[in-house]
Curated annotation (Swiss-Prot):
Localization of this protein: Cytoplasm
EC number: 5.6.1.7
GO molecular function: ATP binding; ATP-dependent protein folding chaperone; isomerase activity; unfolded protein binding
Catalytic activity reported: ATP + H2O + a folded polypeptide = ADP + phosphate + an unfolded polypeptide
Gene Ontology biological process terms from the UniProt entry: chaperone cofactor-dependent protein refolding; protein refolding; response to heat
Record family assignment: Belongs to the chaperonin (HSP60) family.
Gene name of this polypeptide: groEL2
Residues spanning the signal sequence: none
Record-given protein name: Chaperonin GroEL 2
Species the sequence originates in: Rhodopirellula baltica (strain DSM 10527 / NCIMB 13988 / SH1)
Oligomeric and partner information: Forms a cylinder of 14 subunits composed of two heptameric rings stacked back-to-back. Interacts with the co-chaperonin GroES.
Enzyme class: isomerase
Function: Together with its co-chaperonin GroES, plays an essential role in assisting protein folding. The GroEL-GroES system forms a nano-cage that allows encapsulation of the non-native substrate proteins and provides a physical environment optimized to promote and accelerate protein folding.
Keyword set, alphabetical order: ATP-binding, Chaperone, Cytoplasm, Isomerase, Nucleotide-binding
Length: 540
């Protein structure tokens, strides 16, 4: 199949046209006075949103060359959102500003590669300054402010996330799911919970709640399937003598062994409950190890030469309370030693650092939360499905942003932090050579783009606002578009996580540099394109 090609300035100009169209649509949502964007759907009614990444995802341009430029910036906006939870609009606005000014200089005869090097040096200096300007989050209220700003100034979402983070801790897991009512609710799970329930309903102790409740329980952790009754009987006899209930967690329990357990339960000889071990393969073994650490027990594993028939009471874990329902098991207040739990937590943290897989990271984080933190499940409620999906997306963004704030600290918001990186970038210019200086100047001019855009969306001249903020000469003072006043942004609750601003700038500069050093575009012909006149500069 024949391809159509576009070269040099013609190629870059078409990509810029695509980036401009994308940025114009996305940038209108920026700031507290940002406007709504209405997106037509192929089914159902139109979606009304003020979320930059939602708008970006929907954009598909008719012109293939323009679409290539737009799609590359959309990818960067999405990557910024995935990494930091917010900053998609900021990244798009910065990418447009850097690419547009860079292209103007390249057309005038500057060296694209040198400009890109200059951009990279300037961004490195700006990021170092951002990290230096940042400070740790102090208190629940600042976490709430970060969440609210990320969720398009929704204070309810900010407060909700601040409460959840305070409850589960920084190592805790917060999951957001679609609810079944009109109200948004938060459910907290204390202790360790995993998604496996009782293997037989005969283990239930409370028929009103359909739960098996074991107080001051002993916990047997067995890696294999419980199949031989003779192996199990000695342990059951020892456990019955203590008068304590027994929780058995194993790969599976076969019919014969299950019958033995159920008969003992129904006769009142022993309060017992059996559940399948969570996870699969190596992950199952790791999770059983976590439960062993939490309860102070030993994982009975044939790899270690241990047999079920030789298990004594010393090998069993202990927990103050165990609750088992049809699909979940919750272990509260295990008897594990604090130092052993801390070692296990440190080991999981090291694994999180070492892995490159997002899926593995998520699973490690879940294990960490169950050992060191807690779990909060936010069920999003709304009047309509469209509203629910929008609220859920905003909640997820805000959750990432609040975690980013706790991780790397916070900065004054509203584009103030970027504007006050000018001195650091100007210092970097002294070390630049030749056309690299132009690259540094391009970043210098782009740093105020987010503040200009926020002001423009509020109906105020962005250039005037930037000049006014620079004249104040105070890194905390900025323009609060919500009130229309110049104020201390941190005190006003207008704050951004360091990670969000830093990631947005780094990603924007990266894609702009890539676009500026692009020399050729290659794409397929569309059927109808054959009847159109060739575009100037196009070779086919």
């Amino acid at each position: 199949m024949a391809k159509q090609l576009l070269f040099e300035d013609h190629a870059r100009a078409r990509m810029l046209a695509g980036v401009e169209k994308l940025a114009k649509a996305v940038a209108t949502t920026m700031g507290p006075t940002g406007r709504n964007v209405i997106i037509d759907k192929s089914f159902g009614g139109p979606t009304v949103t003020k979320d930059g990444v939602t708008v970006a995802k929907e954009i598909e341009l008719e012109d293939r060359f323009e679409n290539m430029g737009a799609k590359l910036v959309i990818e960067v906006a999405q990557k910024t959102s995935d990494l930091a939870g917010d900053g998609t609009t900021t990244a798009t606005v910065l990418a447009r500003a850097i690419f547009k000014e860079g292209l103007r200089n390249i057309v005038a005869g500057s060296n694209p590669t040198a400009i890109r090097r200059g951009i990279e040096k300037a961004v490195e200096a700006a990021c170092d300054q951002l990290v230096e300007m940042g400070r740790p989050v102090s208190g629940k209220q600042e976490v709430a402010h970060v969440g609210a700003i990320s969720a398009n100034n929704d204070n309810v979402i900010g407060e909700l996330l601040a409460d959840a983070l305070e409850r589960v801790g920084k190592d805790g897991v917060i999951t957001v799911e679609e609810g079944k009512s009109r109200n948004t609710e938060v459910e907290y799970v204390d202790g360790m919970q995993f998604d496996k329930g009782y293997v037989s309903p005969y283990f239930i102790t409370d028929s009103s709640t359909m739960e098996a409740s074991l107080e001051d329980a002993l916990v047997l952790l067995y890696e294999k399937k419980v199949s031989n009754i003779r192996d199990l009987v000695p342990l059951l006899e020892k456990t019955a003598q203590t008068g304590q209930p027994l929780l058995i967690i194993a790969e599976d329990v076969d019919a014969e062994a299950l019958t033995l357990l159920v008969v003992n339960k129904l006769r009142g000889t022993l309060n017992v409950c059996a559940v399948k071990a969570p996870g699969f393969g190596d992950r199952r073994k790791a999770m059983l190890g976590d439960i062993a650490t939490l309860t102070g027990g030993t994982l009975i594993s044939e790899d270690l030469g241990m047999q079920l028939e030789n298990v004594t009471l010393e090998h069993l874990g202990r927990a103050k309370k165990v609750t088992v329902d049809k699909s979940n098991t919750t272990i509260v207040e295990g008897a594990g030693k604090r130092e052993d739990i801390d070692k296990r937590v440190a080991q999981i943290r090291a694994q999180i650092e070492q892995t490159d897989s997002d899926y593995d990271k998520e699973k490690f984080q879940e294990r960490l939360a169950k050992l060191a933190g807690g779990v909060a499940v936010i069920s999003v409620g709304a009047e309509t499905e469209a509203e629910m999906k929008q609220t859920k997306a905003r909640l997820e963004d805000a959750l990432h942003a609040t975690r980013a704030a706790v991780e790397e600290g916070i900065l004054p918001g509203g584009g103030v932090a970027l504007v006050h990186c000018r001195e650091a970038v100007e210092a970097a210019k002294k070390k630049a050579k030749g056309d690299e200086k132009i690259g540094v100047d391009i970043v210098l001019g782009a740093l105020d783009a987010p503040m200009r855009q926020i002001a423009d969306n509020g109906g105020i001249d962005g250039s005037v606002v930037v000049d006014e903020v620079l004249q104040k000469n105070d890194p905390k003072i900025g323009f609060n578009a919500h009130t229309g006043e110049y104020t201390d942004m941190v005190k006003a609750g207008v704050i951004d996580p360091v990670k969000v601003v830093r990631t947005a700038l780094t990603n924007a500069a990266s894609i702009a540099g890539l676009l500026l050093t692009t020399e050729a575009l290659v794409t397929n012909f569309e059927q109808e394109d054959k009847d159109k006149r060739p575009v100037e500069g196009m070779v086919s």
